[in-house]
Amino acid sequence: MKIKSLGIGICLSLFGTFCLGGCSGSSPQPVSRTVTVFDTVVTITVYDKDSEDVLDACVAKCEDYNARFSRTSEGSEIYELNHANGEPVTLSGDTVDLIQKGVEYSRLADGKFDITIAPLSDLWDFKNNTGTVPDDTAIQEAKSHIGYENVRVDGNTVQLLDPEAAIDLGGIAKGYIADQLKAYLKEQNVSHALINLGGNVLALGGKPDDSDYNIGIQKPFAQNGEAITSVKIKDQSVVSSGIYER
């Protein structure tokens, strides 16, 4: 298990973190919105007054990002790019920005993290609860199409130089969205908020009484949400990853 404090969480699976009791201050009462995107339950909680419209806008942003960043939804920008047979595709600014960040982190990780992993990860069919174990021939073929170097960005145009390559932003999108939501909340003069994207937990400030949020780290394989430890944060992020969830 890894616990990190960072702005953009780079993990294939982000889960296992949650707010323990005592996260809310005595006043004002927190207001939350929940939406499911990227196969993840996203909860945004704001502790400032008059935040209903702001939360509605946050939900709309999540749905918009999902519509553009999903690689499995036909009509999304990433789906269009992955099915362009190597032809250049014009994308929105946010999508290009996220791809560029993904390429940069892939470079910094020397390919150990790579946003073009989709041809390989698809072989396991992780969305299927039973899973699939591919044979070595299929694995080697898929690996030949992985390489962030095959992503070419020119302005708002992105091209996959290998027609068989495919981008999967699942390892970086949630952290990126959390950062964007935090930036929006700050623009709206929100001072106290908690953003939970499937275990990628980001705090804006602290609680209304200026104390820390107490973020629980789920015990691996526990079925009842039992916490193995907790982390106190203020204006930081906590991201956990492990092998016990998809």
Tell me the role of every PLM-derived stretch:
Residues 2-246:
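Mature catalytic core of soluble alpha/beta enzymes
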